[in-house]
């Protein structure tokens, strides 16, 4: 998944006095996107796609692939790992930052700062003036970053999944504000 625009993978947390919306980062400071969140996006897009093509078995296919909503019985036949940077990129960043910084530097914070940026938002009144108390700050993952995930599914579902993934163009928070434009590429790996 390549980020075509800045993206907000919200983590549901805020940093008082700094960020109203933060991004998901691992313990090393690298941003990532939850596979389970993407699975929800794919489920929604699959429902739309099957409805659009007029598939009479849409409901059964959805439940077989993704399980039944609200049901904890793990009957689904599709699995997604989290979307992460490549191990090569992560290793090179850690090596380079460690080489350049002193031993007291917060490497995780430096990594996060390299891969993300802060954006400010405000509401504008009818008079064209910023509304009082409306300033918000969000941390965004920089456009151009690529993430990788593994998808495990039944062979009979591969083509449908490929077709639907090609239709996904936006993910994350604030998509209606121009954030979250993505491009997916699929590489098959045989076992």
Q: What are the roles of these predicted feature ranges?
A:
Residues 1-115, 130-191:
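RNA-binding basic/glycine-rich loop and surface signature characteristic of RAMP-family CRISPR effectors
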């Amino acid at each position: 998944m390549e980020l075509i625009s800045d993206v907000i993978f919200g983590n549901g947390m805020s940093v008082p006095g700094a960020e109203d919306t933060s991004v998901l980062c691992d313990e090393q400071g690298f941003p990532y996107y939850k596979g389970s969140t993407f699975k929800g996006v794919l489920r929604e897009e699959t429902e739309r796609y099957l409805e659009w093509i007029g598939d009479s078995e849409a409901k059964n296919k959805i439940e077989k692939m993704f399980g039944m909503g609200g049901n904890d019985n793990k009957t689904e036949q599709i699995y997604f790992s989290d979307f992460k940077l490549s191990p090569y990129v992560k290793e090179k960043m850690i090596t380079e930052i460690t080489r350049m910084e002193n031993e007291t530097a917060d490497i995780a914070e430096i990594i996060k700062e390299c891969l993300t940026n802060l954006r400010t938002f405000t509401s504008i009144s009818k008079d064209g003036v910023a509304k009082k108390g409306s300033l918000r700050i969000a941390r965004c993952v920089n456009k151009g970053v690529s993430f990788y995930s593994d998808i495990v599914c039944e062979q009979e579902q591969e083509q449908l999944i490929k077709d639907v993934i090609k239709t996904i163009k936006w993910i994350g928070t604030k998509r209606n504000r121009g954030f979250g434009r993505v491009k997916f590429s699929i590489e098959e790996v045989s076992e």
